[in-house]
Amino acid sequence: AVGDTITSQPSGEQAEVKKILVADHEAESAFKGQPVTIQLNREVDVSRGCVLEKGSHVRQAANFKAEILWMDDVPLSIGKNFMVFLGTKKIPGILTKIDYRIDINTGEHVEATGLKKNEIALCEIAVTEPIVLDTFDHHRTQGELILIDRISNMTSACGVVTDTSVYDK
């Protein structure tokens, strides 16, 4: 709402909401999911991937766990570099660990050091700096991701964040 103090994450900078525009008309407040333009009372570093919050404390992490579906013809190996698209943020990242592969016929967790096309696994991913994220179950937009191969620019995997609790800021 106009007059509220908000925080831009991940920078932590605060400002007061001076004006809200909804469909080019001034409004006193905005609601979740509404496309809006917000004018602040001072200049704040806000760019694609930043999250504006009021009162809540969003999670930030540079490491997280995600359940991914491997879609690339080239097998996945630990240490592979990607561009990670998470929420509205695009950031370099690396797959650091495969906790287990999920057998799609039995649901069994199977030890794995790589993945082939159409296999699903729980993996650990590290990005180059802390980003705002949440589990998919808690916040769909901040919990879904795509992994893009940095050489071929092809979509290699899609997935959902399953665990940030170990890495909370």
How would you label these PLM feature ranges?
Residues 1-169:
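C-terminal effector/interaction modules appended to NTPase cores
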